[in-house]
């Protein structure tokens, strides 16, 4: 395994299929452009899948979990034990993403990269447990270099399993108490933006809690700020095991030619890191929604992303991405199933 495998070449979209899909859209029985962004979504998927009529029948959902040492600074409204407790909920079918994956006919993989509280072996959970959570990043780097590399590789391996299953779309989700703090710190470093613009309530902090969270991140940036220009160092110093796995998954999707649907704030920060590690992966990332965390908008703008939904979501788990899948499927169905003007014997407008 190359220590910097993420620099490997990404697959390219098929320009011929993009052209053919665009031509088909222009021949369908509707005014050109009348289906708005659904038309471009179908065209983009055609180019990425190399098929004039793309399909999203087979989905893969992985939730990556990991705890964060910065929780010791009092930055979360919930105790750290919740991370492990939610793993049980995921595999027992009671979490939001469990319900949504079931409704979509998608399998759900759960990967424990580093819960702070050891868990019993749970059927349906891959217990990698690279560490008992990250270190407190106001005192030291969140991860060692080897831990970060292993977490990136865990994301890559999840995509490999998705590919072997014949999946056409990858959704990554996350679970980790304290991970909005890590995501905000990473976003500040990667965007060179003020902390106040990128920090929000996470799982439910009040105004004083947000102010404290802001101060904690400012301390972390003061400690690690000299490494802002290096996305790998930013990831390992300020990120989390699950965030690294997400970044690795997005990079692997681009290298294998699988579309990734990016969820909320934390996933979008992981995507931003992936793009900084290998800019060519950007074409393979679709963005599901614009979430309630104030920093999410800034990250999406930096990625020139056009999210599909805006529902005020802030749950994570991959839930927002799962909610956007029916929209993508309908875009594909319209593109493939509508008749052309010639097929329907309907008069087109004059050329």
Swiss-Prot record:
It comes from the Bacteria. Gene3D superfamilies: 1.10.1610.10, 3.40.50.10210. Pathway: Nucleoside biosynthesis; alpha-ribazole biosynthesis; alpha-ribazole from 5,6-dimethylbenzimidazole: step 1/2. The keyword Chloroplast does not apply. Keywords: Cobalamin biosynthesis, Glycosyltransferase, Transferase. Catalyzes the synthesis of alpha-ribazole-5'-phosphate from nicotinate mononucleotide (NAMN) and 5,6-dimethylbenzimidazole (DMB). This is Nicotinate-nucleotide--dimethylbenzimidazole phosphoribosyltransferase. The gene is cobT.
């Amino acid at each position: 395994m190359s220590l910097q495998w993420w620099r490997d070449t990404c697959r390219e979209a098929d320009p011929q299929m993009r052209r053919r899909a665009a031509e088909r859209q222009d021949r369908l029985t509707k005014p050109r452009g009348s289906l708005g962004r659904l038309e471009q979504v179908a065209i983009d998927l055609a180019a990425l899948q190399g098929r004039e009529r793309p399909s999203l029948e087979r989905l893969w959902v992985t939730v990556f979990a990991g705890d964060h040492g910065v929780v010791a600074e009092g930055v979360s409204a919930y105790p750290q034990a919740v991370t492990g407790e939610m793993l049980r909920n995921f595999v027992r079918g009671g979490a939001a993403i469990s319900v949504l994956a079931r409704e979509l006919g998608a399998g759900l993989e759960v990967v424990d990269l580093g819960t702070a509280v050891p868990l019993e072996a749970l059927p349906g959970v891959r217990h990698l447990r690279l560490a008992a959570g990250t270190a407190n990043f106001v005192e030291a780097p969140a991860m060692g270099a080897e831990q970060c590399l292993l977490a990136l590789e865990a994301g890559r391996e999840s995509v490999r399993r998705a590919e072997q299953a014949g999946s056409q779309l990858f959704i990554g989700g996350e679970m980790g108490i304290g991970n909005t703090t890590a995501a905000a710190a990473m976003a500040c470093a990667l965007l060179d933006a003020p902390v106040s613009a990128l920090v929000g309530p996470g799982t439910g902090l009040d105004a004083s809690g947000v102010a404290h969270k802001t101060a904690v991140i400012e301390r972390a940036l003061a400690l690690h700020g000299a490494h802002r220009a290096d996305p790998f160092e930013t990831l390992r110093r300020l990120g989390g095991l699950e965030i690294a796995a997400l970044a690795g998954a997005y990079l692997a999707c681009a290298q294998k030619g699988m579309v990734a649907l990016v969820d909320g704030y934390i996933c979008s920060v992981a995507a931003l890191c992936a793009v900084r590690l290998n800019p060519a992966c950007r074409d393979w990332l679709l963005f599901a929604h614009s979430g309630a965390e104030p920093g999410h908008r800034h990250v999406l703008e930096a990625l020139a992303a056009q999210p599909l939904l805006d529902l005020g979501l802030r749950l994570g788990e991959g839930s927002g991405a799962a909610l956007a899948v029916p929209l993508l499927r309908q875009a594909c169905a319209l593109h493939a199933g509508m008749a052309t003007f010639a097929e329907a014997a309907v008069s087109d407008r004059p050329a």
